[in-house]
Amino acid sequence: MNNIWWQTKGQGNVHLVLLHGWGLNAEVWRCIDEELSSHFTLHLVDLPGFGRSQGFGALSLADMAEAVLQQAPDKAIWLGWSLGGLVASQIALTHPERVQALVTVASSPCFSARDDWPGIKPDVLAGFQQQLSDDFQRTVERFLALQTMGTETARQDARALKKTVLALPMPEVDVLNGGLEILKTVDLRQPLQNVPMPFLRLYGYLDGLVPRKVVPMLDKLWPRSKSYIFAKAAHAPFISHPVEFCHLLVALKQRL
């Protein structure tokens, strides 16, 4: 049975949908869900094949976006972290009337490094894909450790991420591989130039997966969007800086 796991909580006239990153699930938001649900009607989602959304194989980005939309409110702020940022962006491109505002967190429209573009080296992503078939739990843990490296709270942030992964059944290897394939191949730099809704991009200065060099490049490419860098955060600013993170989202709501 292919069912997306979906939880709605809180009250507010503005809906906020949170989409997690690769290898994880919606439990990753528990550090901020109480605060956010006092300002928004909050929607927590396990992406297809992750967490409690079982019964899915590897999906393309477009199919993942369509699957998530099935249970979504008519209109919401869509916030996506890392891989989830690509899913939220895809929804903004294909169903702009459903997106009140787009927020991407530690996400890139093109995660893979190109000649003219900083990112994760393609051979690193290919290496992760290879290692998944050998020892996928260890590979996922390595990927999580990369996400918090360099921050003052790196150890406890990494522990929080690991706890999130271990709280629920691990995704199937083909689902994890499919997610890496999306990170390796998708490039939304040009399409996202024309999104009509407010667009907020949040980054960690110490992020080892989304280099801060992309921020001014995207400021130039997407002049209508706004960017913000958490000075002491890495790839998971909502875990290391929850108060500041929630404040930015409440401020966005007040501007709508």
Curated annotation (Swiss-Prot):
Protein location: Cytoplasm
BP GO annotations: biotin biosynthetic process
Keyword Repeat in annotation: no
Gene3D superfamilies: alpha/beta hydrolase
A GO cellular component annotation in the UniProt record: cytoplasm
Documented EC number(s): 3.1.1.85
Pathway(s): Cofactor biosynthesis; biotin biosynthesis
UniProt-listed HAMAP family: Carboxylester
Biological function: The physiological role of BioH is to remove the methyl group introduced by BioC when the pimeloyl moiety is complete. It allows to synthesize pimeloyl-ACP via the fatty acid synthetic pathway through the hydrolysis of the ester bonds of pimeloyl-ACP esters.
Subunit structure, as described in the record: Monomer.
Name of the protein: Pimeloyl-[acyl-carrier protein] methyl ester esterase
Name of the encoding gene: bioH
